[in-house]
Structures are given as C-alpha cells and as structure tokens.
C-alpha cells in the first residue's frame, strides 16, 4: 500500500509586492474586495472603494511601507519566507509551501506547488493564532474555491487556530521575558490584538474570546498580577464600532495618568508587518510619549524564532 505523502501549507494575509502606490493599490483592492473582510453590500461598497478609498489610501499607505521596507521585501514576506525555510529545514521529507490570501505568493500557487510534489495530504496552518472569520475564514473560503477547480483533491487537515496552545504561549512568554530583561519590567504590559468590527463578534465570531484565552494563558505563564496587563485592539478601519478598548486611546490614557513604562506585544501577529512595525512601534509610541509616558518598548513578533518553529512542528505533528 502506498504511503501517504503529506505537505504543509503556511498561510498568512499577504503584502504588496513593492512600496509604491500602484502596488499598494492592487493589494488593497484585492484585500478590501473580500466579503470576509468587508461585507458591505457591493452596490454601496464598490463606488466607495474604487472612487475614494483606493485613490486616497494607496499613496499614504505606500509611504508607510517605504519606512519599514527591507532589502528582501516587506517585513511580512521576509519573515514568512524565513518561517517556511526554517520549518522545511526541520522537516526534510515534508514539502512546505507558503501562500497568502492576498497578493503573491497566492494560496493557489502554494497548493499547486504541493500537488506538484505529489502530496496526497495537505496540512493547512493559517498563521493567525486567534480564529476570526475575516482571517482564518478567508483562508478556508479561498482553499475551497481552489480545490473546486482541481481534478485531484488531496486530503486536507485544517488547523483552525492555536490561541491557547502551550507551545505558542511558551514562545510568547519567552519573548516577553527577554524584553523585560533588556528593558526592565514595565509598569504595564499591553497586549494589542488586531481589531474586528463589533458586529462580527455579535454575529458569532469567537475572536474576542480567543484573544482573552491567549491573554489569560500568557498572564499565567509570566506570573504577572492581572493589574499589570491590559488587552486592547488596534487597526480599526471605517466608521462602525470595532472591538474595544482601542490601543491608541488606551496608550494616550495611560500616558496622561502618569504610567511611566509600557511594553507592547501583539500576540495575534505571527510575523512583523506594517501594523506592528509602523503602527505599534512608531505611531503608538509617539501617542504614549506625547501624552506624558516616559518609556515605551515594542516586543517583536515571534517571526522565525526557534520557539515559533517548534510550535509549528507541534501543531502539525498529529497530521504528518
């Protein structure tokens, strides 16, 4: 009997190909056209997206990307490639492909790469620790569309999330302890997660609970008193209410009330990107310091650290 050959598909959000208005516009158009991300009726959304949002946001966002762009491309792409290569090095007999929901390399190119390696079974690991319909759900949807076009469909194991997985929590805790050793223990450790519209949660998305699960387990692992840890949500977009409290408003409040030393971690980001390196490490630092805060440090994402790769090995092991 032929032994099953398994491949691993690491999935993440995606990134523009270049820090230019044209490349950013292409990326944002694909991203903001996904109903999992924005579910506004199309007759209302298309004119707003194409006539207002893309022309206005693309040049501004391109400048932000230019401020963080690396020699190998966008940080998200650089670190994602490093993750793929590190995991592949640990699993020499298992093909590992990288696919993005938006931009390049696409999820379809990743599936094709694995099928070309003659795999019978694909383990899909969306690198979103906390499930949300707007992230993990988008990977699920696109995977279904891709496979619907294939004559040969492999077996699929889909890892929904890993918000309270012990290897993930241990990796976060080690990263936080290293930051504490470098900068001193902060007055407040702020855990900033990407926000979603409150309406999504009201309609059944359990993302807020999965963020709370991560926060609870991380606080326990670090042995910090609850009053020294805060959970907030960043990157809100549009006018409808998003999950609260908002990260920027919380940092302003903490600075104004005299909190001296803040360290910020973004547990929901598996790789550093625009939202961490520019929004959190730069914009929100300024907000806190201008409000009266004294010391601010951003704790990097897990990226391709050995502990993060160990976690990926553990999560995929039952399916390999």
UniProtKB/Swiss-Prot annotation:
EC number(s) per entry: 4.98.1.1
The catalytic activity, as recorded, is: heme b + 2 H(+) = protoporphyrin IX + Fe(2+)
Its annotated pathway? Answer: Porphyrin-containing compound metabolism; protoheme biosynthesis; protoheme from protoporphyrin-IX: step 1/1
User: Pfam families, per this entry?
Assistant: Ferrochelatase
UniProt KW Methyltransferase keyword:
no
The residues listed in the UniProt record as binding Fe cation, with positions renumbered to this chain, are 194, 275
Instruction: Give the GO cellular component terms, alphabetically.
Output: cytoplasm
Which purpose does this protein serve, as stated in its record? Catalyzes the ferrous insertion into protoporphyrin IX.
The record's section on HAMAP family has: Ferrochelatase
Name of the protein described by the UniProt record: Ferrochelatase
Q: Which organism is it from?
A: Salmonella paratyphi B (strain ATCC BAA-1250 / SPB7)
């Amino acid at each position: 009997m032929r032994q099953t050959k398994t491949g691993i598909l690491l999935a993440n959000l995606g990134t523009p190909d270049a820090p230019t208005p044209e490349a950013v516009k292409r990326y944002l158009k694909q991203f903001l056209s996904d109903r999992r991300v924005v579910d506004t009726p199309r007759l209302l959304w298309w004119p707003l997206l194409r006539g207002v949002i893309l022309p206005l946001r693309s040049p501004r966002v391109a400048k932000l990307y230019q401020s963080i762009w690396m020699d190998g491309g966008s940080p998200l792409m650089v670190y994602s490639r490093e993750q793929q290569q590190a995991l592949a090095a640990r699993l020499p007999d298992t093909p590992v492909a990288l696919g993005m929901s938006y931009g390049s390399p696409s999820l379809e190119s990743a599936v094709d790469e694995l099928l070309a390696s003659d795999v019978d079974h694909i383990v899909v690991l969306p690198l979103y620790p906390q499930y949300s319909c707007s992230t993990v759900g988008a990977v699920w949807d696109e995977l279904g569309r891709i496979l619907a076009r294939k004559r040969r469909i492999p077996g699929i194991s889909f890892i929904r999330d890993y918000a309270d997985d012990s290897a993930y929590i241990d990796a976060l805790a080690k990263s936080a302890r290293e930051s504490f050793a470098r900068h001193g223990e902060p007055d407040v450790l702020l855990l900033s997660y990407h926000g979603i519209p409150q309406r999504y949660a009201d309609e059944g998305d359990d993302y807020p609970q999965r963020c709370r699960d991560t926060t609870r387990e991380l606080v326990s692992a670090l042995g910090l008193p609850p009053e020294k840890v805060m959970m907030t949500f960043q990157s809100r977009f549009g006018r409808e209410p998003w999950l609260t409290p908002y990260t920027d408003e919380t940092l302003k409040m903490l600075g104004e009330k005299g909190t001296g030393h803040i360290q910020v971690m973004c547990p929901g980001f598996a790789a550093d990107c625009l939202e961490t390196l520019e929004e959190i490490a730069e914009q929100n630092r300024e907000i806190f310091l201008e409000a009266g805060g004294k010391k601010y440090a951003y704790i990097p994402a897990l990226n391709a650290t050995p502990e993060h790769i160990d976690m990926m090995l553990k999560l995929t092991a039952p399916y390999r």
